[in-house]
Amino acid sequence: MENNVYSQIAPSIFKRIFDDTNIFHVMSSLFGMLLLVLILIWILKKISLLKINKNNYFIKTIDRMSLGPNESIVIIKIEEIKLVLGITKNHITHLYTLSSDVKDDVVDKKKEVILPTKNFNDSLKNFAKIFWKKTMFYRIIPLFFLFLFCPLVYADIPGPTSHILRDGSQTWSLPVQTLIFLTSLTFLPAFLLMMTSFTRIIIVFGLLRNALGTPYAPPNQILLGLALFLTFFIMSPTFDQVYKEAYLPFSQEKINMDEAIIKGAVPLKKFMLNQTRNSDLELFSKLAHISSYKNKDEIPMRILLPSFITSELKTAFQIGFTIFIPFLIIDLVVASVLMALGMMMVPPSTISLPFKLMLFVLVDGWQLLVTSLSQSFKI
């Protein structure tokens, strides 16, 4: 039965290959690639041969032995004279002159046995010789022809299609939607910085690290990860609302993409309005030459986004100021004690660091800080 199936499928595949109008394009592309590869190998061989001839025209390096990072012993041949040179970073010293009885073949054989070939030109030359062997050539070439009999060669990429909905709107096929989604991922960092609580959290963590006097502990990766997960925790009610009101209807094809974007922006806009000061909104409205609004829902994103970021920066610095005060007091006390004891050469930060860490641990600083940050957002 398998032989019958193969006997039915194989003729159709061969017929499709040799009767298709695209066979000329496939063959021309295949031979074009082969020709380019052969030309590239020929050019590289010529370049390597020119370099070898140019380097060995007057002086020939017979052997070389490395003694250190910048020290080596080299045997060179100038006409019939063989010199042993000691080479360092700043000097070249003549060590010995070999007798003319020593043949180059003996030295070359020792070099081949002791030292492996590390020259790129020699490796390329050897590769070209291996490639041009008949057995290797006969094994590689049939593979290119076998690719022609693979049915996947004729696979086509589905083109983008559009569909007209009942309400007259237009929607696109899934590949276009996927392309738009992947393109929108490039705006994810800007989304995290401009429309969530990430900015305030990461600034406060950075100021806390400076107040403690530990510029490398916790490391940046830990702070970014903690700020990211804390952002998802604080923004989870907003994200749930976006998921229910925008993504679910869009995935069920109840609304199109434009409506999903508009409905998804409403919860984010509400979150940003709750964190933004009125003074910042008035400032950017004045810069945009907009007098007033009937309600806050009419504020456009081009005014709300910079106002929200400005308010977040101001709030983050206010929280950082309150964090600095107890650690600053410890620094002043330690510096005063060291001055009174006459230990002016001892840096106060070295002595005050253990006291800062002890104070931060005793008051359960991380829990206190995370709780205060979470409660500082109006959701």
Curated annotation (Swiss-Prot):
Recorded superkingdom: Bacteria
Gene this protein is translated from: fliP
Lineage: Bacteria, Pseudomonadati, Pseudomonadota, Gammaproteobacteria, Enterobacterales
Entry protein name: Flagellar biosynthetic protein FliP
InterPro entries in UniProt: Flagellar_biosynth_FliO (IPR022781), FliP (IPR005837), T3SS_IM_P (IPR005838)
Function: Plays a role in the flagellum-specific transport system.
Pfam families named among the record's database cross-references: FliO (PF04347), FliP (PF00813)
Family of the protein in this entry: Belongs to the FliP/MopC/SpaP family.
TM stretches of this protein: 23-43, 140-160, 178-198, 222-242, 319-339, 357-377
GO cellular component, one term: plasma membrane
Subcellular location: Cell membrane; Bacterial flagellum basal body
Keywords noted in UniProt: Bacterial flagellum, Bacterial flagellum biogenesis, Bacterial flagellum protein export, Cell membrane, Membrane, Protein transport, Transmembrane, Transmembrane helix, Transport
A GO biological process held by the record: bacterial-type flagellum organization
UniProt xrefs under PROSITE patterns: FLIP_1, FLIP_2
Disulfide links within the chain: none
Main location: membrane
Membrane topology per record: Multi-pass membrane protein
Keyword Cell membrane: yes
